[in-house]
Amino acid sequence: MAKLSFLSLFLLCLVATATAQNCGRQAGNRACANGLCCSQYGFCGSTSEYCSRANGCQSNCRGGGGAGGAGGGAGGGSP
C-alpha cells in the first residue's frame, strides 16, 4: 500500500511540473502576466534566473548581455 501511495504522489508531482510551464515557446509563445519574465524553461518569475538574457529569458527580459551603445564621437573642428 505504501508503494502505491508513493507512486501516486510521484505521478501527481510529475504531472503538476509538466503543466506548470506556462509561457514562451513551451506554451504557444504566451507571455507571463503582470510583466513577469519568461525563463528559458517556460516558467514565469522576476529574478535573474528568469529575466536575464544570458540565462535564456524568452520575454519581458531585463539586461544581461546587451552590447551597449557606441560612445559619442569626438567634437569635430572646422574644415
From Swiss-Prot:
Tissue specificity: Leaves (at protein level).
Protein keywords: Antimicrobial, Chitin-binding, Disulfide bond, Fungicide, Signal
InterPro entries the record matches: Chitin-bd_1, Chitin-binding_1_CS, Endochitinase-like_sf
Name of a matching Pfam family: Chitin_bind_1
Coiled coil spans: none
This protein's record includes keyword Secreted: no
One Gene Ontology biological process: killing of cells of another organism
Signal peptide interval: 1-20
CDD domains noted in UniProt: ChtBD1 (cd00035)
Record keyword Signal present: yes
Disulfide bonding pattern of the chain: C23-C38, C32-C44, C37-C51, C57-C61
Propeptide: 64-79
Ranges for domain Chitin-binding type-1: 21-63
GO function terms (MF aspect): chitin binding
Protein task: Chitin-binding protein which functions in defense against chitin-containing fungal pathogens.
Name under which the protein is recorded: Morintide mO2
